[in-house]
Amino acid sequence: MAFSGMAFSDDLIKVARREWTRWGGPMEKIDGTLLGFTDPRMEAKHPFWTYVGEYWKSIGSNLDGRDDPAWSAAFICYCFKEAGAKKRFPYQDNHSIYVSQIDSGKFAGLSLEDPEATPLAFGDLLWASRTGHDCRTPPSSFADAKKELKKIREKKADSFCSHCDIVVELRIGEADVIGGNVKQAVTRTTYKLDSQGKIRDGRRNFVGIVKNVL
């Protein structure tokens, strides 16, 4: 359900925080310390797998949460849909696919920016490439990511493995983000920022920021 009387980014953050609370509030602190994880694979435990099933259902998938595919993109799509984005967001089961569609310029209010030059703002998506089982070699920089996204749009390349989190809180030198399938849960992570509010944390390979002014 969509919320009313608030900016879209506020609605999005409200949904992300609600889901994080539903999972019991697991966290990764800025020093890497983990808190609030009740099981190494929370996603496989009841009722958590049923929540994952809700995320899949939001993008029209028949997966019920007891399946193997990574569900972090489904989580992002669920949050946008619940916040009332409707057709203003490209709902897909893979981050690189929906980011490629955003990068096409066809989704007003959403744009892909260079993390080296762009301060984070509330409701932005912090995008990182990653490796993993059955993953092709991912881009290692914003420029490389832009090239790969163009190839995906032109159907000259397959999707690649990556991850997005929603920026939910900003402090001097720190950002809190919430994402799905982070250590097998919906997790709130604190990352380091520089003095200008740009991401400067070596725990992930950040290749883009989806600016969100919906």
Question: What kind of region is each of these model predictions?
Answer:
Residues 1-2, 123:
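Short intrinsically disordered, low-complexity coil segments enriched in acidic
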Residues 2-86:
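N-terminal capping segments
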Residues 9, 13, 174, 206:
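A residue-level signal for beta-strand positions that form part of recognition/binding surfaces
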Residues 32-61, 104-111, 135-156, 195-201:
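Surface-exposed intrinsically disordered loops and tails
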Residues 86-184:
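...with weaker cross-activation on analogous glycine-rich loops/strands in unrelated enzymes
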Residues 176, 181, 187-214:
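Low-complexity, Gly/Ser/Thr/Pro-rich intrinsically disordered linker/tail segments
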